[in-house]
Amino acid sequence: MNRDNTIAWAVDDLCVNYDHSDVLCHIAFSLPSGAMAAIIGPNGAGKSTLLKASLGLIRASSGQSLFFGQKFAKVHQRIAYMPQRASVDWDFPMTVLDLVLMGCYGYKGMWNRISTGDRREAMNILERVGLADFANRQIGKLSGGQQQRAFLARSLMQKADLYLMDELFSAIDMASYRMVVDVLQDLKKEGKTIVVIHHDLSNVRQLFDHVILLNKHLVCSGSVEKCLTKEAIFQAYGCELELLDYTLKLSRGKYQGSC
């Protein structure tokens, strides 16, 4: 496997099985540093599983993942992971500011005191995502879009080089959408690498420069032009293709290639 530090994320022959059933089969790709990538594919394609297995949150049956040429444990401080909103316990007694300050733990450690400077930085980040006025609100009292922005703020507090975000754009309003896009574009300009599990094919071309297209196996990894074709989408989505016709036409104006 490539150990070049210019490769932010490299996956080699990764397989995951649940109850003797294949969830991911022989996934292999490399993502260059500075890319802004969408992981796309139908429901059940293994998109979230790919992130979790790569981070060691679930066990892979074979293969491995490297980040910046190293195992995750060696470079975890350089990686920020944002889970699916649905997986979070929103009743947990934690304020928005507390959530953002959790982003310090990767580089400060769990038991080091949070400083006044840390709190000031967290408030600046909350201002950046439009949540400064909600700093002392319990996280479950936020709207869906605000909750996504709060977790994005926690990721920003980590000062990472690679951001892995599971369904970042899920259940957000237009104001949150625009704010999130602005933040991602700023991160891109800073040379950060961004990976988002994404479902709306109509805006992939506008938001991303790289695609990882899955359906339990890797269909395509590379530029949007390479992967967002009728052939590749049909391979991944199969009989769902007709349902995607309108969104793909919005994305490109027309299909590229033919079946």
UniProtKB/Swiss-Prot annotation:
InterPro entries associated with the record: AAA+_ATPase, ABC_transporter-like_ATP-bd, ABC_transporter-like_CS, Metal_Ion_Import_ABC, P-loop_NTPase
Entry keyword Hydrolase: no
GO MF term (any one): ATP hydrolysis activity
Alphabetically ordered keywords of this record: ATP-binding, Cell inner membrane, Cell membrane, Membrane, Nucleotide-binding, Transport
Disulfide cross-links: none
Signal peptide: none
SMART domains linked: AAA
One of the record's GO cellular component terms: plasma membrane
Domain (ABC transporter): residue spans on this chain: 9-241
Residues where ATP binds: 41-48
Coiled-coil regions listed: none
Keyword ATP-binding: yes
Compartmental location: Cell inner membrane
Family annotation (SUPFAM superfamilies): P-loop containing nucleoside triphosphate hydrolases
Membrane topology qualifier: Peripheral membrane protein
Function, in words: Part of an ATP-driven transport system TC_0338/TC_0339/TC_0341/TC_0342 for a metal. Probably responsible for energy coupling to the transport system.
Stored PANTHER family: IRON TRANSPORT SYSTEM ATP-BINDING PROTEIN HI_0361-RELATED, METAL TRANSPORT SYSTEM ATP-BINDING PROTEIN TM_0124-RELATED
Family assignment from sequence similarity: Belongs to the ABC transporter superfamily.
Record protein name field: Probable metal transport system ATP-binding protein TC_0339
Organism of derivation: Chlamydia muridarum (strain MoPn / Nigg)
